[in-house]
Amino acid sequence: MRSWSAPKVPRLPGVGAPLRLFDTAAGEVGPTQPGPTARLYVCGITPYDATHLGHANTYLAFDLVNRLWRDAGHEVHFTQNATDVDDPLLERAEQTGQDWRELAEREIELFRTDMEALRILPPREYVGVTEVIDQVAELIELLRDKGATYDLDGDLYFDVAAAPKFGAVSGYSEERMLDLFGQRGGDPDRAGKKHPLDWLLWRAERPGEPSWPSPFGQGRPGWHIECTAIALANLGSGFDVAGGGSDLIFPHHECGAHEGHVACGEWPFAKAYVHAGMVALDGEKMSKSKGNLVFVSRLRKEADPMAIRLALLAHHYRSDWEWTADQLASAEVRLARWRSAVGLPAGPEAETVLAELRARMTDDLDAPGALAVVDAWADRALAGGGTDPGAPALVRDIVDALLGVEL
């Protein structure tokens, strides 16, 4: 599956500092320590509706990770999936009388357009699940050969007893896991399972549903194994960061980590699990199932996409927050001031801005702190302070390279 066009990223003087991020599994901020090539996997959309601000907030967070690794001198191998066959997609297609493949294709194309508009750096591999069913089946077969699966009425399940470190990613109690499992696509109450937290690897063919041949019969993959297979095929085990929204901590990232562990015999599957906070509207998490969405495609018809990006950057990536129209208005004012400042013939020296932005952003992506640094420089510049003719252009490049905002 094709990705989207990459924006040009300016090269900055010097080299950025090592990036530190909050690892959910460790419960603390720690250094990322990639080799020459940093490896990043970010879970993608289920394409049954347009990209909303919750999605944008997540993908912006990992775009910052990508940019800061590059600034520190690393190549970045970034892989992302699209869950282009799944229950919500099939249900929406049936409700609206559309072919599920056409619905997925249309929403994926809209997602690409939104990501380009927001200047999100594209993945090297953008992989639709339907493109790699054979790879997913091979991984399930490996897990079966290792004794980690069992059959239940033609469906194949992962036996949680085969995962001795289960719970290590989320740190959740079994009670909380069971509650979330039922809310997020699991089936803890299904009769015949060995344990309520055992999860589906392969769903046997059902009437009216798409299916593919496999060593286990006709059917389609479960959700968690899809990302595990795509990450392993492109990045290998022990990649640097697995990322997504905080609603993926459990069960998605927890289950994927143990599929990878059993398959490869290596722990951890990802060196760090990093999660973005949830964006709310009207007091509830923005989600397709609730229908309380602010779509990026609609918002960018009304506002400069760079103002949308700035509105998101005003919140720390791990925080949960509520969207209001006032935030976009404030971002538009900020964007206009910054553009006025970098359009001046001279301004205050910018080397300190570069050092401070690198310090803020490499400390667990402190974007609000970084915005304050640029605000202060712009205020001084617009007040007539500074005589450095190269400063405005350097600040423009700094903001572009590290924050992804084109001025």
Swiss-Prot record:
This is L-cysteine:1D-myo-inositol 2-amino-2-deoxy-alpha-D-glucopyranoside ligase. Its EC number is 6.3.1.13. Gene3D superfamilies: Anticodon-binding domain of a subclass of class I aminoacyl-tRNA synthetases, HUPs. A motif ('KMSKS' region) lies at residues 285-289. Binds 1 zinc ion per subunit. GO terms for biological process: cysteinyl-tRNA aminoacylation; mycothiol biosynthetic process. GO terms for cellular component: cytosol. A motif ('ERGGDP' region) lies at residues 183-188. Keywords: ATP-binding, Ligase, Metal-binding, Nucleotide-binding, Zinc. Belongs to the class-I aminoacyl-tRNA synthetase family. MshC subfamily. GO terms for molecular function: ATP binding; cysteine-glucosaminylinositol ligase activity; cysteine-tRNA ligase activity; zinc ion binding. Catalyzes the ATP-dependent condensation of GlcN-Ins and L-cysteine to form L-Cys-GlcN-Ins. A motif ('HIGH' region) lies at residues 45-55. L-cysteinyl-5'-AMP binds at C43, G44, I45, T46, T58, N81, A82, T83, W223, G245, S246, D247, V279. Its cofactor is Zn(2+). Zn(2+) binds at C43, C227, H252. It catalyses: 1D-myo-inositol 2-amino-2-deoxy-alpha-D-glucopyranoside + L-cysteine + ATP = 1D-myo-inositol 2-(L-cysteinylamino)-2-deoxy-alpha-D-glucopyranoside + AMP + diphosphate + H(+). It comes from the Bacteria. InterPro entries: Cys-tRNA/MSH_ligase, Mycothiol_ligase_MshC, Rossmann-like_a/b/a_fold, tRNA-synt_1_cat_dom. It is an enzyme of class 6 (ligase). Monomer.
